[in-house]
Structure formats: C-alpha cells, structure tokens
Amino acid sequence: NKDYLFDSEERLEIVRNALFKDLKMNKKKIILISFKSLTTNLCKKYKSNIILRGLRAVSDFEYEFQLAGMNKKLSEEIETIFLMSDIENQIISSKFVKEIWKFNGKIDNFLTKSATKILKSKLK
C-alpha cells in the first residue's frame, strides 16, 4: 500500500483540472470515477471487460502483470491492455517530484500547471 499525499477526492480533482483545464479535453467523452472496491467489480458495474493500465518502465510490468492475472482469476471475461507512456514521461514518478521539490528544484516540467500549483500549496 502506498502512502498518498492527497486523498482520493483531491487526486480526482487534480486529474479533472489536468484534463479539462490544462489539456482542454472534451468533458463529454471522459468519465472520472473514484472507487473503493475491486477493479473487476467496477468493470461489471459499468459493463466493461477491458482494463487499461499504463506502464512507465519494465519495473512496473511485474506488478501490473500479477495484478492482471488476479483480475483475470476474479473475472475471466476481463482483459487487461498495457500502454507504454511516452518516452518523456517514463522517468516521472511522484516520489521523484516530491524529492526535487524538497530540495528546491523546479517541478514545473514534470506536472501540469494546475497540478504544480496544488502540489506547491500542499507541500508548503
């Protein structure tokens, strides 16, 4: 389990701002959901049989592969599709961004404008 700096509602708001304010994506085509249950249960609720997971590095794959296997055991009809992140984003992690901020480094290149603003206010 991860210790999160932001609770689930705050994380949802960060994603909402990044997608709709910073990246100007179409709100009508994206649904953001925060949930506290098994992903397979969420898939069933929304009649989806596909889980998309992002990978930054080979080190992510082992965990994600095991997770996909467990999801398959829980719900045979669900398939997991892995997407590699763009090369420019493969090095970014919350741990590194917080470390850079801690030592007064510039984090603007790693986050959207709204996420940078929220993180800076949280880490004061």
Q: What label would you give each PLM region?
A:
Residues N1-K124:
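Nucleotidyltransferase catalytic core that binds NTPs
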